[in-house]
Amino acid sequence: MTIQSPTIEAPTAVQPKLRFTPEEYFAHEERAEYKSEYHNGEILPMTGGSINHNRIARNGLTLLTVQLQDSSCEPFGSDMRIWIADHQLCTYPDLAVICGEPLFYANRNDTITNPVLIVEVLSPSTEDYDRGRKFQAYRTLPSLQDYLLIQQEAPLVEHF
């Protein structure tokens, strides 16, 4: 019987994060079965919302649609992306409103650059991001006039 000593492998280097161009991100989104956000070269999968989250977003879209029907403004739900050039960030807010003609990123009719209102329904897993890094990026949009954060666990709406 021969006893062999264990093989010890040299440690491997930490794999660098994959970096993608915006064009690669959009190509990924077109064939993906889930939504992702683009963060300065990284593609980050999004989590789904709770039933309350979806109810609040749906009710908000319905309310905005009725209130804005005779205006030059148009509300959009969470399938409309927003591109924030200064941060190389592409997000899917819960609701957005455009007034006047939409301005599209790279002639893509699914990605706007000129929202006047952005609404996020807060979730425990995303609240810090919605209040922090994402809000910081949204503030660089020249068109943005209002940002609303809606709590789903309590009747609270914050307006910035």
What are these regions (language model features)?
Residues M1-F160:
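Gly/Pro/Ser/Thr-rich low-complexity, intrinsically disordered segments predominantly at protein N-termini
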